[in-house]
């Protein structure tokens, strides 16, 4: 079931070009209609939110017009994080939620992401139904002119409700911690003051003045350099950085070192296990997590399960097998006991709570994980679908793995989106890892490279 409009994260594109207001209207209209067919209510209720990028209001208004045209009751949340929408859909018992964001991508992009009433991404089946309507030659959906049209109301209490929910996910306040908070000039900007003040944190906000054009710009979880500097200059205990829509969190320890998603999962997983809260003693990760994290988990008798790259696959695995902690190196971390998607502010509170409760510094807690040097090589290939069947490629991979003898790993896989073969290796030293990647790369070039 290949979808034309919906990618792994909803409908994405360059705002006002690929993702035009006209398309947003149609996505609202088609999505709204599909919901009316599956809802028990006479008038389905949908929550709509956006991040801080300048195109958000244009797309929000177009999308809402589409929803109203097929009779949906819309509650407009304004600027709220993606996980905020996922939580509020469930708390409000709405039929769906829609988030307008392109997450960590550059400002010219935007996207439309639907959540079902359960707070998870819409099912593939429902997305397929919406696609069928978007692709139809003519729009035959109902067009009421009076009774049967939808209504819209601002729902500012939503943000307060979400903040109170976050606060009750940790058992005590966080007094005594000094923390720098980087809001990426994104959707968390309006939340951090209330949240961290309520938790009695001595906090220093940075990059919390969105102007519509500065979301993620040299700041936030994808550019933590300004956070590293601020933590050291302010002699803070640690720093946390979110991304544009608030579904990621990366930390910086008291010495100014980056503590990525792998290390955060390890620290929180070990703590949850000690408290008897980690289901099946297991952390769910993607294949891109660092070998150092797996070794640290093993040293504490904790298990891990690997999925394909993408937080949706992590969530699928967690739901299927009853795990409650998982995530990605990039900082999408899912605490399934609390929320249905990666949640940056929730992750930050859990991490701060562990730091306070342990009495250790973040640097000490992260020290258990020795990050192995990692190198990634992309090679353009003629046919990525058959690349992995090449005998010589299989042989060199097996040879390298034998030489590593458990102190390193190789991951060779076709790109999900481009005609590339991705060769990733981790080993004890940068020199070794470079040698391994190049040896596999040489064979791939000779056997598979585009002429």
Swiss-Prot record:
Listed EC numbers: 5.4.2.10
CC cofactor note: Binds 1 Mg(2+) ion per subunit.
Active site positions: 103
Pfam hit, one: PGM_PMM_IV
PROSITE patterns: PGM_PMM
Keywords, ordered alphabetically: Isomerase, Magnesium, Metal-binding, Phosphoprotein
Family indicated by similarity: Belongs to the phosphohexose mutase family.
Name assigned to this protein: Phosphoglucosamine mutase
Organism field: Limosilactobacillus reuteri (strain DSM 20016)
The gene coding this protein: glmM
